[in-house]
């Protein structure tokens, strides 16, 4: 017999019918293989049930504090990234950083001082670290808070 798509069949014994339990005294009737009485005979044990000991979700400590709804999360851009994206220098604003894909739109931007900057740039952002401001001004640029 050749191996063709219309000749494919499962191997003998590979597919067995589902055993229907609790349907008469023939096979797996009455108690359906669950034994007699007890929680396991009646329905099912809850997934997180630990046999009566204190469950893990109650043993673990509660989290302290609260989530501050007014917390401002800044997107950060380092000086080496600005140097890489704007090698000719010039004015760099939040819109320019969004256009180049350095940050996402709609979130405040903070410029951090990792790396070096070799060109004079006029950077306007929502916040600057002290190191970033020093390095930008040392390279002949300016910083403006938006």
From Swiss-Prot:
Q: Name one Pfam family in it.
A: Ribosomal_L27A
Gene Ontology molecular function terms on file: rRNA binding; structural constituent of ribosome
Residue span of region Disordered = 1-39
Q: List this protein's GO terms for biological process.
A: translation
Q: What does this protein do?
A: Binds to the 23S rRNA.
Family, according to the entry, reads as follows: Belongs to the universal ribosomal protein uL15 family.
> By what name is this protein known?
Large ribosomal subunit protein uL15
């Amino acid at each position: 017999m050749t191996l063709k798509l219309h000749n494919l069949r499962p191997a003998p014994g590979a597919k067995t019918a589902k055993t229907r339990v609790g349907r008469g005294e023939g096979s797996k009737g009455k108690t359906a293989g669950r034994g007699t009485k007890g929680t396991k005979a009646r329905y099912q044990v809850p997934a997180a049930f630990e046999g009566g000991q204190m469950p893990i979700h109650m043993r673990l400590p509660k989290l302290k504090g609260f989530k501050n709804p007014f917390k401002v999360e800044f997107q950060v851009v380092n000086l080496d990234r600005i140097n890489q994206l704007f090698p000719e220098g010039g004015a760099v604003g939040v819109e320019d950083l969004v256009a180049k894909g350095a940050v996402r739109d709609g979130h405040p931007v903070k410029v951090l001082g990792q790396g070096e900057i070799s060109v004079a740039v006029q950077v306007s952002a929502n916040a600057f670290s002290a190191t970033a401001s020093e390095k930008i001004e040392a390279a002949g640029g300016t910083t403006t808070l938006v």
